[in-house]
Amino acid sequence: MTLRLSGIDLRHSNGTLALRGLELSIAQGERVAIIGPSGAGKTTLLNLLASALPPSAGQLEILGTSPWQLSSRQRQQLRRRIALIHQAPPLPPRQRVVTAVLAGKLGEWGLGKSLLNLLHPLDVPGARNVLARLDLADKLFVRCQQLSGGQLQRVGIARALYQAPEVMLADEPVSAMDPRLADHTLALLCQHAIEHGVTLVASLHAVELALAHFPRIIGVRDGQIHFDLNASDVSREHLDTLYANEQLSTAPRTETPASAPWTPRC
């Protein structure tokens, strides 16, 4: 298994129990969507899977190793094999898009090469190619502060694709995009995962997108796994219970009409 959790609890420093009793296995090459209401623990779970947060109890295995039994150096080497796509990518405002994308390889480069890349981007064609897949090739030398929220999200995705990881974890990666663009972007991510055998786990508020693109759906509520089902087995009853007391989101928040057509699942 690429990712395995057994009896996992995670308690934040303020004492809040964010995850409790998680049992979960995800195989290499699986595409999994995590859905659930706000505050359910989706982002915390992704940070746990990225080895950015340690569990408070239980056993965590990532790519065949227990990350918190490794040295800091070994754990950093493990993280090179994992890409975490943030809902709001932490990109310096004055950084150029080409540099932001090439930062996907910083974990592999030494200090000297990394500093040189800040002055003279080392792989402009590579950055251009991955940006072109996301319809951003014309933004190659634009500063990040000039981009919209949806464009910044696509730059974060481009950086993850350029990194070429074995595991890709995406936290609300299309929340700032209109429905058509969100659908296209998720289709691209899923197709990349299929072609390269990448394990893809994404948290999504837009349930319709999750069901359209991911074969496996995990519902999380109150820090626990509420259900773990094939997409075809997820019923309205499952969703009503998962999102009790919260309005169900079927598409990203946008000014674009929600009736925009959806393309087939990847």
Give residue ranges: language-model regions:
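The feature captures the beta-strand-to-loop junction immediately N-terminal to the Walker
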Residues: 35-37
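Conserved ABC transporter NBD signature motif
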Residues: 58-66, 78
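Conserved ABC ATPase "signature" region
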Residues: 113-138
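H-loop/switch region of ABC-family ATPase nucleotide-binding domains
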Residues: 204-205
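Helix-to-loop junction immediately C-terminal to a conserved catalytic motif
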Residues: 50
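Conserved ABC ATPase signature
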Residues: 143-147, 151
